[in-house]
């Protein structure tokens, strides 16, 4: 719901409805992930009407810090993070619930211009979580790392399983190979909407991110190890799984120094 406001403002800025990014990105065309197979994945939830509601994903990068998308925390709400989560509708016995104490969005983030980039935020938790088999820190890439075209990647999240569908209750995953910047920024793909501080993945018209996946990780295999190379940012307003409109992510390796500075100063 919150990201549709961003989408509406982009339309007013003159973008064609064929190419307007919709920043409310769930896993379409995926399958249920094996329980706790992605232990750095978190559920970001907001409080409303006395209940907590899933709104975005995120990645645990320190025991008391989470990386997510800036558009996920634009609204002044009370947020909490759930780690060790798999099924949102039941208690798995592995969850830990921690309130968000501080939100630090990138200073250049503009909610009215998502295609400018900088869609990244860090959340400081009220206390450190306990690391175990179900809760682990995400591995981040080296600063400046650029994925090769067609690198093996997975998107994970509790987002919608189809355009305008329902949120998933169990964590989903979908194989989304990366798409190089040169291809993704071509006129037959996203054109100038995609910047070199972003990562594209998918675009086969079958599998994609969708509403509810925003802020969550893109896990990519490089040198035999999965690392979180992307933060789910936007999809096409024509639908989540549109051919030649790959899911677009904030490129994590472009913000390593910024994140280190935020954590060190907070």
Curated annotation (Swiss-Prot):
So which cofactors does this thing need?
Answer: Ca(2+)
Residues annotated as domain Peptidase S1: 27-264
* Active-site residues (renumbered): 71, 119, 214
Q: Name one GO molecular function term.
A: serine-type endopeptidase activity
Q: Which Gene Ontology terms of cellular component type are present? A: collagen-containing extracellular matrix; extracellular region
Question: A single GO BP annotation from the record?
Answer: proteolysis
Which stretches of the sequence are propeptide? 17-26
Point out the signal peptide segment. Answer: 1-16
CDD domains for this protein = Tryp_SPc
Which InterPro entries does the entry mention?
Peptidase_S1_Elastase_sf, Peptidase_S1_PA, Peptidase_S1_PA_chymotrypsin, Peptidase_S1A, Trypsin_dom, TRYPSIN_HIS, TRYPSIN_SER
Q: What class of enzyme is it?
A: hydrolase
Which residues are noted as glycosylation sites?
87
| EC number(s) recorded for this UniProt protein | 3.4.21.36
Q: Which UniProt keywords apply?
A: Calcium, Disulfide bond, Glycoprotein, Hydrolase, Metal-binding, Protease, Secreted, Serine protease, Signal, Zymogen
- Glycoprotein in keyword set: yes
Reaction(s) catalysed by this chain, per the record, are: Hydrolysis of proteins, including elastin. Preferential cleavage: Ala-|-Xaa
Function field = Serine proteases that hydrolyze many proteins in addition to elastin.
Q: Belongs to which family?
A: Belongs to the peptidase S1 family. Elastase subfamily.
This chain belongs to the protein called Chymotrypsin-like elastase family member 1
Write the gene name.
Cela1
């Amino acid at each position: 719901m919150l990201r549709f406001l961003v989408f509406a403002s982009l339309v007013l800025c003159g973008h064609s409805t064929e190419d307007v990014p919709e920043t409310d990105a769930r896993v379409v065309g995926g399958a249920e992930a094996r329980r706790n197979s992605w232990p750095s994945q978190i559920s970001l939830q907001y409080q409303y009407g006395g209940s907590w509601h899933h709104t975005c994903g995120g990645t645990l990068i320190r025991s008391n810090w989470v990386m997510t998308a800036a558009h996920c925390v634009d609204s002044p709400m009370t947020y909490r993070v759930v780690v060790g989560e798999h099924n949102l509708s039941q208690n798995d016995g592995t969850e830990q619930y921690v309130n968000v104490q501080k939100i630090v969005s990138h200073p250049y983030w503009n909610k009215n211009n998502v295609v400018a980039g900088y869609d990244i935020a860090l959340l400081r938790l009220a206390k450190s979580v306990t690391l175990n088999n179900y809760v682990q820190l995400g591995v981040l890439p080296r600063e400046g790392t650029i994925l090769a075209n067609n690198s093996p990647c997975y998107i994970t999240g509790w987002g919608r399983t189809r355009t305008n569908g329902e949120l998933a209750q169990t964590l989903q995953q979908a194989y989304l190979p990366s798409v190089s910047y040169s291809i993704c920024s071509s006129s037959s793909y996203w054109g100038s909407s995609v910047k070199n501080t972003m990562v594209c993945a998918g675009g086969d018209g079958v599998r994609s991110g969708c509403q509810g996946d925003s802020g969550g990780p893109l896990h990519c295999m490089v040198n035999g190890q999965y690392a979180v190379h992307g933060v789910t940012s936007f999809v096409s307003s024509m639908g989540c799984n549109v051919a030649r409109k790959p899911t677009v992510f904030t490129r994590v390796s472009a913000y390593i120094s910024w994140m280190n500075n935020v954590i060190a100063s907070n």
